Amino acid sequence: GEEIGGHVVSGHVHTTAEICAQEETENNREVRFRLRDREIVKYILPKGFVAVDGCSLTVGEVDEKEGTFNVWLIPETIRATAFRVKNVGGSVNIEIESSTRAIVDTIERYMERKEKEKTG
């Protein structure tokens, strides 16, 4: 079979985000999103995956305090998706990558258990 580009997207919408900034550069477009539910940011990791309006994208930078993250779109992604008509202030659907969510939740449960054992 052929290689899967990106990650498996299930179509679940975990939250929405607002496009808070866009900047065109010579070869791509940087888009910054502000999450509606900021606690979701713990699942969005630099160089990790996130689905934005069903499109699998690689995360650039994450600002946990502000609940924002950015992606870089190449011209082909802009051309082939709805990103060609998205503007600052617009809303998008966000799907968290399932294995990242499972890993973060597992580590949190483990750390909580260890803390309880310590304070026991």
PLM region spans:
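Conserved loop->alpha-helix
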Residues: 1-120
